[in-house]
């Protein structure tokens, strides 16, 4: 009587790429935009310069941008 042996995946078993589970955080990282991954939002130097370039100066020394944002240096 022949008995069949089922192979179980183990350290020596190589599974095809389609049957491998994804790394634990890969699905979350792919679904999350890069700007949302950091704990605090950061403005780049170019973004700050663009805000300042579009600003209108007020008499109080503050700068109000075209969209109404107030930038205090």
UniProtKB/Swiss-Prot annotation:
> What's the protein's topology in the membrane?
Lipid-anchor
Give the propeptide segment as residue ranges.
71-73
- Presence of keyword rRNA-binding: no
UniProt-listed InterPro entries: Pheromone (IPR012597)
Keyword terms of this UniProt record: Cell membrane, Lipoprotein, Membrane, Methylation, Pheromone, Prenylation
Region ranges (Disordered): 1-41
- Report the subcellular localization: Cell membrane
Question: Which residues are modified by lipidation (S-farnesyl cysteine)?
Answer: 70
In its keyword annotation, does this UniProt entry include Nucleotide-binding? no
Q: Which domain of life is it from?
A: Eukaryota
Q: Which GO terms describe its cellular component?
A: plasma membrane
Q: Which GO terms describe its molecular function?
A: mating pheromone activity
Major subcellular site: membrane
- According to the UniProt entry, which residues carry Cysteine methyl ester? 70
Function text:
Activates B-regulated development.
Protein name, entry field: Mating-type pheromone BBP1(3)
């Amino acid at each position: 009587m022949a008995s069949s042996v089922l192979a179980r995946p183990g350290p020596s078993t190589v599974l095809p790429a389609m049957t491998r589970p994804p790394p634990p955080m890969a699905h979350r990282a792919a679904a999350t935009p890069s700007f949302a991954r950091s704990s605090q939002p950061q403005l780049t130097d170019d973004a700050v310069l663009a805000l300042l370039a579009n600003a209108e100066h007020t008499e109080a020394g503050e700068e109000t941008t075209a969209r109404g944002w107030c930038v205090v240096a």
